[in-house]
């Protein structure tokens, strides 16, 4: 019998793979995602699927916007996936593929697929996967899975998720079709949207601080240049007098 890896082992693997310091503003986002994925992947009822992968990449890409240095983001994502014994390239490819379905089919067709389980031709085996979720009483629901569903709905029909009444109707139908716990779905998506707003506000404040710091630095540099120019001019005048 295989021994399940512990959270400490997962974290240790992550920090072994990504050795650069984490930007303190984003540390909580990174570690919470790592812990969430760890707890899911060691659960006996958990099954990886492309919609879950889309949830993972959506959360990472959305909440890591503005991370500096930018070049570290790929290393962090790769380390998270590998720390939970996943393939980062597969996560990316599966997420991109399932999201591309929204471009290959109409918004109505995608919504009917997720909310009524009407087969979507371009979805291939995902049709059977959704039916399997519906029929599996032990399906391991997760916040990342519903964020993947929400991202598909938002991509296919942005006006629906932006309208409270339409969003409520669609999510209710989706939960009924897939046998998902509506109370958990509401709680997870409310928190997700709330965190998006907070992150956007924090990012805006950070951008203002960076912009103000840049202007102050440019002003100091200009003042220094002016001072240097004045000193140079004084030297020339002194030499001329001599």
Segments predicted by a language model, with ranges:
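N-terminal domain-start signal
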Residues: 1-93, 169, 175-183, 194-242
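Short, recurring structural edge motifs at helix starts
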Residues: 37-46, 129-139
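Transmembrane alpha-helical segments and their cytosolic interface motifs
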Residues: 49, 118, 137-143
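Hydrophobic/aromatic-lined pockets within catalytic cores
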Residues: 61-64, 153-157
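Extended, low-complexity, amphipathic alpha-helical coiled-coil/linker regions that act as scaffolds
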Residues: 67-69, 141-145, 157-187, 191
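Alpha-helical interaction scaffolds
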Residues: 88-117
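Intrinsic, low-complexity N-terminal interaction/targeting segments
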Residues: 116-132
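A structural feature that tracks compact, well-ordered secondary-structure segments
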Residues: 148-152
């Amino acid at each position: 019998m295989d021994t399940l890896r512990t959270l400490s082992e997962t974290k240790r693997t992550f920090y072994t793979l990504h050795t650069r310091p984490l930007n303190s503003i984003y540390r909580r986002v990174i570690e919470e995602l790592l812990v969430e994925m760890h707890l899911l992947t060691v659960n006996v009822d958990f099954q990886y699927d492309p919609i879950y992968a889309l949830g993972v990449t959506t959360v990472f890409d959305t909440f890591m916007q503005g991370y500096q240095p930018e070049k570290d983001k790929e290393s962090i994502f790769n380390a998270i996936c590998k720390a939970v014994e996943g393939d980062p390239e597969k996560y990316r490819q599966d997420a991109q593929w399932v999201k591309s379905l929204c471009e290959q089919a109409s918004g109505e067709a995608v919504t009917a697929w997720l909310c009524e389980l009407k087969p979507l031709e371009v979805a291939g085996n995902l049709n059977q996967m959704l039916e399997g979720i519906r029929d599996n009483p032990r399906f391991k629901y997760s916040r990342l899975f519903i964020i993947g569903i929400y991202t598909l709905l938002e991509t296919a029909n942005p006006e629906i998720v932006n309208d409270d009444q339409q969003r409520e109707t669609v999510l209710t139908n989706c939960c009924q079709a897939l046998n998902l716990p509506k109370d958990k779905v509401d709680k997870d998506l409310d928190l997700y949207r709330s965190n998006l707003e907070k992150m956007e506000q924090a990012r805006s404040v950070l951008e203002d601080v960076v912009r103000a710091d840049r202007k102050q630095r440019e002003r100091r540099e200009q003042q220094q240049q002016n001072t240097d120019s004045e000193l140079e001019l004084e030297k020339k005048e002194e030499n001329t007098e001599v």
